[in-house]
Amino acid sequence: LLDSEIFNTNGYGTHGMMLLRNRFFKTCAFNTNLQDWFFDNDITQVSRLAGYTTARDIKDIKLVITESSVKYFKFMPKDMPFEQKCKRFLDALYEGKNSSVFGVVKADHDAPLMDGMMAYTNYQLLNTIGLTREGVGKLLEPSFEYLQDMLNRSPFLRYQINMTTDHATIAENEVPDLAKYRRDTVLDMSCRTPLFEQTEFYKSFRSDTVRYFKERLRKGRIAVSGNYQVLFGNAYEFLWALTDESYEPTFSFSLDDGQVCTTGFAHGEMVLCARSPHITMGNLYLAQNAHCYDLLRYFNLTPNIICVNAIESNIQQRLNGCD
């Protein structure tokens, strides 16, 4: 759990998670309102926190991790006291300095289509959801309509070009790439005059784009409403464990069995979840989306994050060993 202040001051305020790396350290840190949690539960002293910290003021708590994030512990004697392990790790991390720089490997990001509202399927998913012939037709219907719009309306073709390619202005000393030149020409000229759509240049490019789109469909790359989301397991229970040393995770405070929480879908909506990759139909998880107040209060969730419950649940096995 990483305090929202760190996200905001380092240019990641719009993100819900960052994958952090340091010396023998890696963790997936989620955007958390730690100070709000401390305030709401009247926690003003670090002595009331479970675990180990070198902080002297509760306002200095910025990052909360579990032992699994510290790979340095693997190289220490098993019988060494936990506090001594932490001190050795911090000595190696800071090397006598007052600060240590963490690397951000990646952060959550929107789905590639329709401003983050749609993503592509793959053959693995399509082969495990048990589609009938009628179901396949219904699934492909929006793609066929989009395909027809590309043939008939230039704005749709321009959107397809922008969506599938990164294009930039050719520098004076750069050798022009033919494919890039064709894309940029179509983007520019089709905006200037509708007469350009009658040229062989435009028609040839449109045919190639449509052919590429069809090939993607044959490979199982179908645009659907959804996203590739980051799993956040038992977030609210993590906060309880932080402030209650006697806490035992015997049940979920935030989510009932068969519920998930994501801002990417409406409250009460049924969502089909699957890990990528997965193996069989048994790896699919049909859940109800619940906008839990406690999760939305203490965590700055983006539509790219989904909160799940693994307490007294087989979700980790069902989703093919997800973590």
Language-model features: locations:
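Conserved small-residue
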Residues: 1-321
